[in-house]
């Protein structure tokens, strides 16, 4: 697979609609061609302190005045038209995307959504790796990675994993 959009969301709280950050990395022809990161005003607009302090480092002041997801999505759509999504742990990111689209009345018609975590578990023997966390899989595959839970870094790590594990597939 050489053409896709890697996507990663960070949320402010346990609600899947509470997107506070989105990262996208577009691959075409087996090369990364575009990157996008946006802060998003979450809905509902409250933060769980642990998420801010221990997970993504995004605080209410960071998203005060940021656009809501529907405005950000209108900017994203031209990038994703006709391309499959990939995510590391797609169960989370697809649930977040579907919930936000439902909440904002956005027609969600993007069918293919693949999981690089699932593919890593299929391809990398359990005895060869300490765990299947995103930073660990990147390290195992020799992919530079830092700033875990920064949406753009996670999307880029996911994209590079997809290119490595599915790169020869059409």
Report residues per predicted region:
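Conserved non-catalytic scaffold segment of RNase H-like nuclease domains
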Residues: 1-104, 108-110, 131-149
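Short alpha-helix plus adjacent loop in nuclease-associated cores
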Residues: 114-131
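Short, conserved phosphate/pyrophosphate- and ester-handling motifs at nucleotide-, phospho-/glycolipid
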Residues: 154
